[in-house]
């Protein structure tokens, strides 16, 4: 058996608690990404880079060292400290307690990876190289951002409205299928 592949899945986490342990650049990037999908993001660290000031009203900030009490009720945990031992401890705890965990400096402890993505309203395009080339993922994301610009948010909304109208108004299953696929 070769490399373990990640299963592509979209999770609805808007009401789920996401805890990020760490206050540096990686933690900040992870935090801003999760804020696009969850309203319950908690950051734990004694020290924070200045950028966290920009999002302090959108997240819960706990200025303290890591303690497992902070992640007991979390659905998703990101271990992004500058201490490999602490990240390892978080990863082990989460794996033993059935939590989704991403350990930024040890993928063997992670049970999920956050792909690069383009989000245009409900259109979500994910890009992953399985961790082999984050720079290629970033390049592909940049290319897709040019192709799928901000107008796609409205386009997807219009398609969704048309789909609902067809489902509501067209009783014949075969005719509905033809209209939905055209």
Regions found by a protein language model. Give the residues of each.
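Residue-level detector of alpha-helix initiation sites
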Residues: 25-26, 85, 131
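Hydrophobic beta-strand scaffold residues
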Residues: 41, 61, 100-101
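Short loop/edge segments at beta-strand edges and connector loops
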Residues: 45, 62-65, 105
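ADP-ribose/adenylate-binding Rossmann-like module
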Residues: 76-80, 87-113
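Short basic, glycine-rich beta-strand/loop surfaces that mediate nucleic-acid
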Residues: 75-81, 115-131
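An accessory alpha-helical subdomain
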Residues: 131-182
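Glycine-rich, highly charged phosphate/nucleotide-binding loops
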Residues: 56-72
